[in-house]
A protein has these predicted regions:
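A short acidic/small-residue loop/turn micro-motif
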Residues: 68, 107, 128-132
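Active-site beta-strand termini and strand-to-loop segments that position acidic
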Residues: 53-57, 115-118, 128
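Conserved beta-strand in the GNAT
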Residues: 61-63, 114, 123-126
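Residue-level marker for the onset of beta-strands and adjacent loop->beta junctions
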Residues: 16, 48-49, 76, 109-111
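N-terminal beta-strand motif that seeds the catalytic metal site of vicinal oxygen chelate
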Residues: 1-29, 76-78, 127-133
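Vicinal oxygen chelate
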Residues: 22-26, 78-122
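Core segments of cupin and vicinal oxygen chelate
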Residues: 9-13, 19-60
Length: 133
């Protein structure tokens, strides 16, 4: 008997949502809305409210940290693409993010770095450096 084929996981939009664990989701969604201009802010109702931002079809969910998942830099890092690395890096720092790794130059004229949000979570940033000379 042949095994049942597995359903396709990777679709045209493989990433649906990213969860960021924070001690104060309301404060975090306000910060991320300022840090990620153009995002659309949502809040699902009680009893367990969920705060999230819609970033062009990818949901950034700000959820309470707990005994299973703490806030902070451990684990995976999601890298966000930007068309202007230097301007986006400066904007995030102005919003209160702290540089953690980099920035550094990588292949094909791209730059990348990791920053920490005010709760210690890592934000990966990647994109081209724009020559302003």
């Amino acid at each position: 008997m042949s095994p049942t084929p597995a359903p396709a996981i990777v679709a045209s939009r493989p990433i649906l949502a990213v969860l960021v664990h924070v001690p104060d989701p309301e404060a975090a969604v306000a910060w991320y809305a300022r840090a990620l201009p153009g995002s659309v802010r949502h809040r699902l109702p009680e009893p367990d409210p969920v705060h999230y931002l819609d970033l062009g079809g990818v949901m950034l969910e700000l959820v309470p940290c707990d005994e299973k998942v703490a806030s902070g830099p451990a684990g995976s890092v999601v890298y966000w693409h930007t068309p202007d690395f230097d301007a986006s890096f400066a904007h995030l720092v102005a919003c209160g993010a702290t540089p953690y790794r980099g920035p550094g130059d990588i292949e094909d004229g791209q730059r990348m770095c990791q920053l920490r949000d005010p709760w210690g979570n890592c934000i990966g940033l990647r994109g081209p450096a724009i020559d302003r000379e």
